Each structure stands twice: as structure tokens, then as C-alpha cells.
């Protein structure tokens, strides 16, 4: 735990992959640090055996960069999107989906909440729609006071429609005729290569061989 200038810059770093904890356990620790210790930020670092010390664990697939990325995405959901760890993971399902970001994965497992009507949903509901960020949600709420919004408006606002289109309607209509089916939407989302950042795709570690 680091402190600076009072306790304004409290932060914690966790090394990922050196010990056998699941993502669920790691995120529960982070959630506790935020809620009970008022931490400003938790950092996650993929374990790298820099000195090749034989006493340290060897990770055949290389540093778990994709796992680190998913933890950061989930951390963002905790801090800015009102998610709780127990909504994202459980003891029976303790690790994040490597193929999908945590928000998309949550939405797929809770299709009963979708589609969301853009012109009526409140701010907190909009936050849970894949492809809609905090700024976009605020802009939607503000813009629809003047006029009903359509999909072209959402694109201008900054909504990532290639993800959001499966989960929203504008004035009762979806962007395209779309089946609200978990397998169908999952396959479509996985086909979106932005689910895995380019720098990780290009890293060349064995952990990414599933995506080649």
C-alpha cells in the first residue's frame, strides 16, 4: 500500500499468475480495498520471471497479459459502472471469459434484461449495455430530452454499435433483425477482434494461440 500527500494517492499493486488465486478472489480483494480502505486505484501486473529464478513459478504460456487486461476491465466496471464482483464472477465460475470483455460476458448471461430501450432507460441501466460508456450514457440522457434518438444519433454520440446493437432498441426497433440468443450473439462478439487488444494479439505468447 502506497501513501502520498495525506491518503489521496493510496494504491495497491497485485501480481497476477505467480500464485494460484482465481480472478474471483483477486477481484474480491480489490473490491474490499476500494470499499473499506478507500483506495484510489488497484493495479494488476502479469507475473514475469525476469531473472529466471528457479525458485519462482514458470508459466509455459508466458506472462498472462490477456488475464491482466480482463482484470483491468473488470476493475473499471467496479469503479465507474456500479458493478459488484459477485455479479461478474462466482465461486462456481471464478475466472473471466478470455474471449469476451467482462461487460459483454455479463450481458450475455443476463439477456433477460435486454434489449434496453435507448429513449427510456435510465443512466444506470444504460451503463450496463455493452458498447455504451459513462460519457456516452450521459450524452444519451441529455440528448433525448430534445428529441428521440435513433442509431445514427448513437453513432455520433460515441456508442460502439458493433457491440451495442445486440442489446438495444431505438423507439422499439433493433438496428438489424437480431436473434436475442446467447450463442448467436456470443459468436458475433467473439468475431470482433477488438475484444483482444492489438498489442496483446501481437505479443506472440502461447496464451493467445487459441485466437490464431
Task: Describe each model-derived feature in a short phrase.
Residues 2, 19-80, 140:
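Radical SAM enzyme [4Fe-4S]-AdoMet core and its adjacent flexible, acidic
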Residues 1-9:
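Single conserved hydrophobic/aromatic residue that forms the stacking wall/gate
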Residues 10-13, 47-52, 87-102:
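A glycine-rich phosphate-binding loop feature that marks nucleotide/adenosyl-phosphate handling sites
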Residues 13-19:
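A conserved mid-domain beta-alpha-beta active-site/ligand-binding segment of alpha/beta enzyme cores
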Residues 95-125, 151-212:
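C-terminal extensions
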Residues 143-144:
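Residue-level signature of tetratricopeptide-repeat
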Residues 67-97, 124-127:
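C-terminal accessory region of radical SAM enzymes
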Amino acid at each position: 500500500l502506497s501513501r502520498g500527500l495525506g491518503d489521496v494517492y493510496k494504491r495497491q499493486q497485485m501480481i497476477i499468475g505467480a500464485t494460484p488465486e482465481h480472478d474471483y478472489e483477486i477481484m474480491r480483494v480489490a473490491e474490499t480495498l476500494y470499499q473499506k480502505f478507500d483506495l484510489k486505484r488497484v493495479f494488476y501486473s502479469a507475473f514475469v520471471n525476469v531473472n529466471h529464478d528457479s525458485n519462482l513459478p514458470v508459466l509455459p504460456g508466458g506472462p498472462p497479459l490477456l488475464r491482466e487486461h480482463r482484470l483491468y476491465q473488470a476493475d473499471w466496471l467496479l469503479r465507474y459502472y456500479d458493478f459488484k464482483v459477485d455479479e461478474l464472477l462466482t465461486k462456481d465460475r471464478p475466472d473471466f471469459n478470455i474471449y469476451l470483455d467482462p461487460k459483454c460476458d455479463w450481458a450475455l448471461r443476463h439477456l433477460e434484461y435486454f434489449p434496453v430501450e435507448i429513449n427510456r432507460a435510465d443512466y444506470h441501466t444504460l451503463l450496463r449495455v455493452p458498447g455504451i460508456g459513462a460519457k456516452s450514457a450521459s450524452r444519451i440522457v441529455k440528448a433525448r430530452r430534445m428529441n428521440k434518438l435513433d442509431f445514427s444519433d448513437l453513432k455520433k454520440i460515441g456508442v460502439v454499435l458493433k457491440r451495442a446493437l445486440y442489446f438495444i432498441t431505438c423507439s422499439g426497433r433493433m438496428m438489424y433483425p437480431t436473434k436475442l440468443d446467447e450463442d448467436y450473439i456470443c459468436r458475433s462478439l467473439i468475431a470482433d477482434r477488438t475484444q483482444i487488444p492489438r498489442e496483446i494479439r501481437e505479443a506472440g505468447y502461447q496464451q493467445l494461440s487459441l485466437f490464431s
